[in-house]
């Protein structure tokens, strides 16, 4: 019996950057694919919700177009697995996300980011790849303490640039 594939999560910004052909993001994802070919890339429901919102109501036409391209890429199913539902009650996800904001790991107004982080932890993702400053700025040590209350482990939160800089040879 083989080992369970490593789970990785991408946030909305990652999917938009991939849709736009951002070289740094393409390089990071290619590097991860090369180093971890069996990795299970997950897209959580809150990321899907934000992407759907941006497709219809993004501030600019280019943003709406990028969101549409990102959805088409998701439907191809070549890299990412969209998680339409999670095997957890939504009130539990909300409780974890609320605690993340109450502890000021993420600003109170960034509800979506706290949900992305909570879902990544609940899905047991080892890595959350993002270019979002709020997610990237999370104090990992404090996040560990907060998530341990829920018997969860935090993902490593990294930007595509960090992945390329640290692991490209």
Describe these PLM feature segments.
Residues 49-51, 87-93, 160-169:
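A short acidic, often aromatic-flanked loop/helix-cap motif at beta-alpha or helix-coil junctions
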Residues 27-29, 114-116, 144:
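A generic local structural motif
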Residues 1-71:
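Short, well-structured N-terminal submotif of metal-dependent ribonuclease cores
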Residues 79-127, 133-137:
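Active-site neighborhoods of divalent-metal-dependent phosphate/nucleic-acid chemistry enzymes
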Residues 31-32, 119-122, 145:
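A generic secondary-structure signal
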Residues 64-88:
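Low-complexity, serine/threonine/proline-enriched polar segments
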Residues 32-35, 71-77, 146-152:
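Short, conserved catalytic or adaptor-binding loops enriched in Gly and charged residues
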Residues 1-5, 10, 22, 43-44, ...:
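Acidic, PIN/NYN-like endoribonuclease modules and their adjacent C-terminal/linker elements
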């Amino acid at each position: 019996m083989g080992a369970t594939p490593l789970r990785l999560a991408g946030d909305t910004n990652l999917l938009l950057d991939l849709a736009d052909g951002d070289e740094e993001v393409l390089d990071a994802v290619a590097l991860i694919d090369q180093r971890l070919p069996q990795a299970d890339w997950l897209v959580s429901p809150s990321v899907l919700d934000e992407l759907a919102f941006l497709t219809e109501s993004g501030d600019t036409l280019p943003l709406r177009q990028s969101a549409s391209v990102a959805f088409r890429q998701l439907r191809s199913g070549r890299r990412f697995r969209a998680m339409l539902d999670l095997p957890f009650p939504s009130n539990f996800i909300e409780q974890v996300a609320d605690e993340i904001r109450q502890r000021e790991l993420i600003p109170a107004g960034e509800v979506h980011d706290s949900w992305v982080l909570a879902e990544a932890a609940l899905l047991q993702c080892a890595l959350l790849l993002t270019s979002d400053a709020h997610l990237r700025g999370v104090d990992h040590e404090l996040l560990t303490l907060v998530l341990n209350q829920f018997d969860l482990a935090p993902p490593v939160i990294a930007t595509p640039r960090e992945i390329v800089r640290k692991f490209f040879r």
